[in-house]
Amino acid sequence: MADAAVHGHGDHHDTRGFFTRWFMSTNHKDIGILYLFTAGIVGLISVCFTVYMRMELQHPGVQYMCLEGARLIADASAECTPNGHLWNVMITYHGVLMMFFVVIPALFGGFGNYFMPLHIGAPDMAFPRLNNLSYWMYVCGVALGVASLLAPGGNDQMGSGVGWVLYPPLSTTEAGYSMDLAIFAVHVSGASSILGAINIITTFLNMRAPGMTLFKVPLFAWSVFITAWLILLSLPVLAGAITMLLMDRNFGTQFFDPAGGGDPVLYQHILWFFGHPEVYIIILPGFGIISHVISTFAKKPIFGYLPMVLAMAAIGILGFVVWAHHMYTAGMSLTQQAYFMLATMTIAVPTGIKVFSWIATMWGGSIEFKTPMLWAFGFLFLFTVGGVTGVVLSQAPLDRVYHDTYYVVAHFHYVMSLGAVFGIFAGVYYWIGKMSGRQYPEWAGQLHFWMMFIGSNLIFFPQHFLGRQGMPRRYIDYPVEFAYWNNISSIGAYISFASFLFFIGIVFYTLFAGKRVNVPNYWNEHADTLEWTLPSPPPEHTFETLPKREDWDRAHAH
């Protein structure tokens, strides 16, 4: 330790070899980059599943997923018996990988690890080795997930076709050991997230810069802190549910088997008690990123800092008391339904506070439409659409009609695929220059945004109409009446897929040939959190001399 203290900010020379730096890292910045990189790879796999599903749904009838063998080119002359199991496997792994292995690791593990310590002026995380363990457990979870996909499952085929929620009795009766591997994958990734959450909570509470009281902490650090509490309180519940599943499958218990006095609805309650906080775990770090981006490019401090923090805390608390709105059709009493309706609508209040505060921040600002700001704008617009359909679905009588239709698919993809993912892209474009020391080409970032914006709206907006017409979710085929909007939805999927491939190209171009960034702050003086006082990329050890108050507290500086 005495050695480390000698090197101040001036020492940029990194003596670590490639293997030491990336495989044995305890450095929060390197681990954050590893999380982002891995989430990107898993994201590509999941997106390929999506495109394959949309290919199948582009026209009525089954053209690609055949029992005779899956194909990528439709052949009208060849016989094709629908392979429902393959379809269910696609649905399942798209959901599991996206939820557990892409968005949470990217936002919480990637940006959270990298920027939360920088925002509060901490030299590193509180437990750097635990941080390393969290990342490698996540990698083990990914490996188990992929192994599950390739292991023998139901119908004498590979993989588990049970949907990402793993409902019994499907998941308890699925043959093969694919399902058990999937359960272990979720276990391991959950343990990884819990360890990460403990680390982040400890760091946030104990390692803030001198003078940085709780309500002077930047909003992104707050969002990650609140997310960590949600993870810590909800993931153990999920672990309990899937452990019971494992027992039912392998050890003869009957937690979810009515014949033995169990109850499958019990599983639904336990799962959704995790599953609803889960969606706030996904979106809250996105909120934090968007706050910083909007403040920077509207060239104004964020409007209503304290209500913004309290709104995130309120969303976090309310997120735990609304879980059964996923289960209106599972036979709840009228009183229960009334309560869950009211509680669900209450969440719209703190969410509304945040949306209107973002609008108020931009109001009267001098807005600059750089790429990160475009993503933030897209986020606001699309997240609001998703929120409005959420209010519709919160009504039990309406949910009777919409439950398990494409209306629900449209709703949660507007919030996640067009909310969280736009948050991730906003963060990437906002910080890639800081993380890599090279800046992306502005035209390419803007083109990527417009491709993704148009493509993703083309996918999911028509699905509202399909849901209104009564098209059920999770089916490989559909009557010809639904063909028109399905076709348009699939075209949108191709555009979005192209935009994602283009994005991968932008990232590699930036890392290897992008314009070098020579200044700590390449945006403007309204990017005023501590990472903008450091060189780009930051040195291996940051804040060895703790930051001074005027570095981050604008009120104090003037």
From Swiss-Prot:
Residues 60-82, 152-176, 252-262, 332, 396-404, 470-478 are periplasmic. This is Cytochrome c oxidase subunit 1-beta. Pathway: Energy metabolism; oxidative phosphorylation. It catalyses: 4 Fe(II)-[cytochrome c] + O2 + 8 H(+)(in) = 4 Fe(III)-[cytochrome c] + 2 H2O + 4 H(+)(out). It comes from the Bacteria. The chain crosses the membrane at residues 29-59, 83-120, 127-151, 177-206, 218-251, 263-299, 304-331, 333-364, 370-395, 405-437, 441-469, 479-514. It holds the Pfam family COX1. It is a multi-pass membrane protein. GO terms for cellular component: plasma membrane; respiratory chain complex IV. It is found in: Cell inner membrane. Its cofactor is Cu(2+); heme. Fe(II)-heme a binds at H94, H413. Binds 1 copper B ion per subunit. Cu cation binds at H276, Y280, H325, H326. Its EC number is 7.1.1.9. Heme a3 binds at H411. There is a cross-link at H276-Y280 (1'-histidyl-3'-tyrosine (His-Tyr)). His-276 and Tyr-280 are involved in the formation of a copper-coordinated covalent cross-link at the active site of the catalytic subunit I. Disulfide bonds join C66-C80. It comes from Paracoccus denitrificans. Residues 1-28, 121-126, 207-217, 300-303, 365-369, 438-440, 515-558 are cytoplasmic. Belongs to the heme-copper respiratory oxidase family.
